[in-house]
Amino acid sequence: MYVMFLLSILLVLGFVSISSKPSPIYGGVGLIVSGAVGCGIIMGFGGSFMGLMVFLIYLGGMLVVFGYTTAMATEEYPETWGSNVVIWGVVLLGVGMELFMVAWMVEYGGFGVGDVFGGVENWMIFESKEGGVIREDSLGVASLYNKASWFAAIAGWSLFISVLIVIEIIR
């Protein structure tokens, strides 16, 4: 419980560091840390196969992209997080919002956000003579392509547009 809570806080703080990046080098490091923490959260909830696949695919692709863009956008004196008041303001605002959300969850026990998927009997079920078992990895992939196929299409399109934007920026 507390490990997942700590990983969730690290994930949000990683995203805050990405949003307030002063230099492309720090943005890439923030994405790598956030990706690793997100995969740790997936593995903590029992999705060991899914966490490993996301870790390998995400970090494999992102390391290539950020290695290339960092090499093309190297600065002699990169701006750090402490060199600008606006960057400190964004970081402190993000940390403040995170502390507010933690206090809210401690006080009220959560946000009540969630989606209940019905009809899981058509998804990946491993059956034997004694009964059936639904694995979290298979259920997550099946729900992504069954109930949330629009999300997969939007994610693919966003990644394609992101690659085009990165190529245009560094050209």
Swiss-Prot record:
Gene Ontology biological process terms from the UniProt entry: mitochondrial electron transport, NADH to ubiquinone; mitochondrial respiratory chain complex I assembly
UniProt catalytic activity: a ubiquinone + NADH + 5 H(+)(in) = a ubiquinol + NAD(+) + 4 H(+)(out)
> Which Enzyme Commission number(s) are on file for it?
7.1.1.2
Main localisation, per the record?
mitochondrion
Would the keyword Transcription regulation be found if you checked this record's keyword annotation? no
List GO molecular-function terms, semicolon-separated.
NADH dehydrogenase (ubiquinone) activity
Q: List the disulfide bonds.
A: none
Q: Which family does it belong to?
A: Belongs to the complex I subunit 6 family.
User: Under what name is this protein listed?
Assistant: NADH-ubiquinone oxidoreductase chain 6
- Gene symbol of the encoding locus: MT-ND6
